[in-house]
């Protein structure tokens, strides 16, 4: 049966109706950097570890960083994966990294860039050798060095601090291999030299060691105190400007004294002593991950009120120690809720609702009530 004029009219009416509905929907917000902002704070060492790596929407990137500024924290640590930026060997995609860094700077924030995560072309064939995205063999150290050089050169004048790798004293972060401090130092040397070629004034942070008590024969990792000693023994001293450290309190209060036999926030003081013992007292420590979890679903968490108390004390502690440049708490916000105990680390929900810890820390950090 041939279409009638009525059927044509109905089809046209449906098309117009649907199209009108589509164009009436609100589009993505137009995001501009806006006028430069200044962080108002009582504590110039306060920071947070943001997780914008997988945040696709520009307005969400901007809003996250606005909330950091409004809280009164002038520092952020952010991950810039090699695997994302140099997905193919010959090309670099700076678009998302530019977005994060430019918005952070517009909010008056100082960015510490954590570099790592190996692209597919620099990892073993997973069909032959199953591993993680953190596996990098010596044959590709130069490739990582080239990436570090490109990153530092691209962000000269915008990023002044980089962290080389993350928690290399854990097997998972070393590609499911037995950890190797000497191999990490070799990687650090390559990265340091290439970074300084691009910008002699860049601050290269080493370590970012996970606080752990794993013994020397463990397949899971190695005690961070032992690992740092091994780094010095392997000649690391000449290839980093400052130490990145992780300071998690678990169930212990901030004031719990440092002890080599347990993990607590002040364990970082033991790392500092190792630096002093090796003649590195002049170097600073940047605490790039830290904090307490307040999830009721995890046996290593604390109550929300305890988390607030310990965090307030930790920021005060940082101000009292001149060898600490900054203290970044994990983790400000996840792009998507984890729906498990990991959400107990966050300060702001995925839909930008401040949690109680945000509001309490904001009250401590802000110099005025103006936003």
Predicted region positions:
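Substrate-binding cleft and catalytic face of glycoside hydrolase catalytic domains
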Residues: 71-216, 250, 281, 334-338
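Short, acidic/polar
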Residues: 55-70, 143-151, 221-233, 308-316
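Noncatalytic carbohydrate-binding groove/subsite architecture in carbohydrate-active enzymes
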Residues: 141, 145, 179-308, 338-341, ...
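Boundary/entry segment of secreted carbohydrate-active catalytic domains
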Residues: 21-74, 79
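Acidic/histidine-rich helix-loop elements
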Residues: 46-60, 129, 133-138, 219-221
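Structural recognition of alpha->loop->beta junctions
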Residues: 72, 149, 155-160, 227-242, ...
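Aromatic-rich peripheral "rim/lid" segments of glycoside hydrolase catalytic domains that contact
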Residues: 7, 11-41, 46, 95, ...
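Hydrophobic faces of well-ordered beta-strands that scaffold small-molecule active sites
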Residues: 44-50, 76-78, 111-115, 162-164, ...
